C-alpha cells in the first residue's frame, strides 16, 4: 500500500489489489465448485448428500474465517499510521486465535452435524454421504483457518498477487485428490461424494505447508521479523475478537440463511435438492466478483482512514462501486445466455439440467443484489464499523428471507422457488440498510475531519 495523489493513481492501485483478489476468490470458491461438479458427475444421490453437508458446514466455517479477517483492517490502520512494527505481533495473535477456533469448529462438526442430518427427513443414503463428507472435511479445519490468517496478512500488506499465486495451487490439488478419492482411481479406495471432503482437506494441508515456506522466504516480509517468537497477548486477542466477531456474525447471518433454505429443501425430492444446490453453488462462484470488490475496499479504505485521509477513502468508495457495476453487467449477461450450459456442468440428466437452469435464472437477481450490498460491507469494515452492520444484517436476512419465503410457499404454488424469492428480497433489504449505515459513518468522519482543521 502507498499514498496516491490523483484519481488515475487510485484506479491503478485499486485494480492492482482487486484483480489478484478476484483470481484468489475464484480459486477459493472453486474448491466448493469442484466438489459439487465432480460429485454430480458421480451420481445425483451423492450430490444431494454433499449439498446437505455444505449447508451445515458453510455458515460455521465462514463465521470463523470472518473473525480472522479482522486482521486486514487492524494491519491496514497500523500501516496508515506508520506503525509497521505492530504487524508481526497482531499476525501471531490471530494464528493463536485461529487454532482455538479450529477446535471449536471441529467439535461442532463431529458432535452436532450427524444429529442434525439424521433428523431433518433426509433419505438414509443421502444422510450417510453427508455425515461422511463432513467427517473427512473436518480433517482440514486447521489448515483452512491458518491459511485464512496468512492470506489476511498478505492482503493487508498489499501483496494480493502473492496470495493469488498460493490460492491458484488449490484448484489442481483439489481436483487431483478428488479424482482419486471420489472415483477410486489408481487403486485408491472409491469413496464417492464423501471423498470430495477428504480431497479438499488434503489440498489445504499441502497449501498450508507451501504458504508457511513462502512466508519465511519472501524478501518483502523479512522486515516484519516473523521468525521471532511472540507470546500470547490476551489484550490483542480480545481486540481481534471484538472487531472480528461482528464481521463473522454478519457473514454468518447471510450464509446461514442460505444454508437453512438448503436444509428446508430436504422436504422436496432428491432431484430438487441437487438442482437447488448446483444453482446455488454456481451463484457462489459468481459471488467472487462482488466479494473481491468488498475485500479490496476493506484494504484501501482502512489504509486511508488510518492515515486520516477521509476524502481519499471516499474516492476509493466511488471507484469500487462503479467497478462492481461494470463487472455485474458482464456476469449477468453471461449467465443469462449460458445458463443451460452451466447446468450441464453438474449432471447429464435432461430433467436435472432443465430444473437447474430455472434456478439459475433466479440467481441473476442474487447477483444484482450482491453487486450493491457486498462492497458496502467491505467499506464499513474499512472504517472499523462492524457491530451495527452485524445487527443490520441479522435484521435484513433473518427478518425477511425465511418469513417471506414461507409466506410465498404457503400462498402460492411456486414450491422451491418461493425460498429463492425470499432470499432475493432479503438481499435487497440488507443492501439498503448497509447503505444507510455508510451514510451515517461517512458524515461522522467528515464532521471529525472538519473539527480538527
UniProtKB/Swiss-Prot annotation:
Q: Which GO terms describe its cellular component?
A: plasma membrane
Annotated membrane-spanning segments are 12-34, 54-76, 96-118, 128-150, 162-184, 194-216, 243-265, 285-307, 319-338, 358-380, 387-406, 416-438
Q: Name one GO molecular function term.
A: antiporter activity
Q: Name one Pfam family in it.
A: MatE
Recorded hits in InterPro entries, A to Z, give:
MATE_fam, MATE_MdtK, MdtK-like
Keywords for the protein's UniProt record, in alphabetical order? Antiport, Cell membrane, Ion transport, Membrane, Transmembrane, Transmembrane helix, Transport
Protein localization: Cell membrane
What's a GO biological-process term for it? monoatomic ion transport
Q: How does it sit in the membrane?
A: Multi-pass membrane protein
This protein's record includes keyword Nucleus: no
The record's principal subcellular location, in a coarse class, is membrane
Function per UniProt: Multidrug efflux pump.
Similarity comment text for this entry: Belongs to the multi antimicrobial extrusion (MATE) (TC 2.A.66.1) family.
What protein name applies here? Probable multidrug resistance protein NorM
Organism of derivation: Streptococcus pneumoniae (strain ATCC BAA-255 / R6)
Amino acid at each position: 500500500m502507498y499514498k496516491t495523489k490523483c484519481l488515475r493513481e487510485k484506479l491503478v492501485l485499486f485494480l492492482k489489489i482487486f484483480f489478484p483478489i478476484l483470481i484468489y476468490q475464484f480459486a477459493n470458491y472453486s474448491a466448493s465448485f469442484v466438489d459439487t461438479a465432480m460429485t454430480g458427475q458421480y451420481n445425483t444421490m451423492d450430490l444431494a448428500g454433499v449439498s446437505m453437508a455444505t449447508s451445515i458446514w458453510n455458515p460455521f466455517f465462514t463465521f470463523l474465517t470472518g473473525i480472522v479477517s479482522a486482521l486486514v483492517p487492524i494491519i491496514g490502520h497500523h500501516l496508515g499510521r506508520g506503525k509497521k512494527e505492530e504487524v508481526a505481533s497482531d499476525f501471531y495473535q490471530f494464528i493463536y486465535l485461529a487454532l482455538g477456533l479450529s477446535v471449536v469448529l471441529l467439535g461442532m462438526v463431529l458432535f452436532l452435524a450427524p444429529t442434525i442430518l439424521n433428523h431433518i427427513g433426509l433419505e438414509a443414503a443421502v444422510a450417510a454421504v453427508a455425515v461422511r463428507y463432513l467427517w473427512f472435511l473436518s480433517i482440514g479445519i486447521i489448515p483452512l483457518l491458518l491459511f485464512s490468517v496468512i492470506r489476511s496478512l498478505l492482503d493487508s500488506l498489499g501483496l494480493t498477487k502473492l496470495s493469488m499465486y498460493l490460492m491458484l495451487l488449490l484448484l489442481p490439488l483439489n481436483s487431483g485428490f478428488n479424482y482419486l478419492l471420489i472415483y477410486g482411481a489408481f487403486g485408491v479406495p472409491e469413496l464417492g461424494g464423501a471423498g470430495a471432503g477428504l480431497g479438499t482437506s488434503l489440498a489445504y494441508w499441502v497449501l498450508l505447508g507451501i504458504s508457511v515456506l513462502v512466508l519465511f522466504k519472501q524478501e518483502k516480509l523479512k522486515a516484519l521479523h516473523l521468525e521471532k517468537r511472540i507470546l500470547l497477548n490476551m489484550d490483542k486477542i480480545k481486540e481481534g475478537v471484538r472487531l472480528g466477531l461482528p464481521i463473522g456474525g454478519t457473514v454468518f447471518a447471510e450464509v446461514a440463511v442460505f444454508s437453512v433454505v438448503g436444509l428446508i429443501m430436504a422436504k422436496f425430492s432428491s432431484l430438487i435438492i441437487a438442482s437447488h444446490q448446483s444453482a446455488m453453488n454456481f451463484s457462489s462462484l459468481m459471488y467472487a466478483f462482488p466479494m473481491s470488490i468488498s475485500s479490496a475496499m476493506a484494504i484501501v479504505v482502512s489504509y486511508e482512514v488510518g492515515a486520516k485521509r477521509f476524502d481519499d477513502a471516499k474516492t476509493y468508495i466511488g471507484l469500487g462501486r462503479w467497478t462492481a457495476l461494470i463487472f455485474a453487467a458482464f456476469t449477468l449477461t453471461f449467465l443469462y445466455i449460458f445458463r443451460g450450459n452451466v447446468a450441464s456442468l453438474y449432471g447429464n440428466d435432461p430433467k436435472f439440467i432443465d430444473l437447474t437452469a430455472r434456478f439459475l435464472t433466479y440467481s441473476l437477481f442474487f447477483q444484482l443484489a450482491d453487486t450493491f450490498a457486498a462492497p458496502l460491507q467491505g467499506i464499513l469494515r474499512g472504517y472499523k464499523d462492524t457491530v451495527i452492520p452485524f445487527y443490520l444484517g441479522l435484521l435484513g436476512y433473518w427478518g425477511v428471507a425465511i418469513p417471506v419465503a414461507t409466506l410465498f410457499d404457503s400462498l402460492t404454488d411456486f414450491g422451491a422457488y418461493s425460498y429463492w424469492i425470499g432470499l432475493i428480497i432479503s438481499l435487497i433489504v440488507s443492501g439498503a440498510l448497509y447503505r444507510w449505515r455508510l451514510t451515517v459513518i461517512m458524515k461522522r468522519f467528515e464532521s471529525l475531519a472538519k473539527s480538527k482543521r
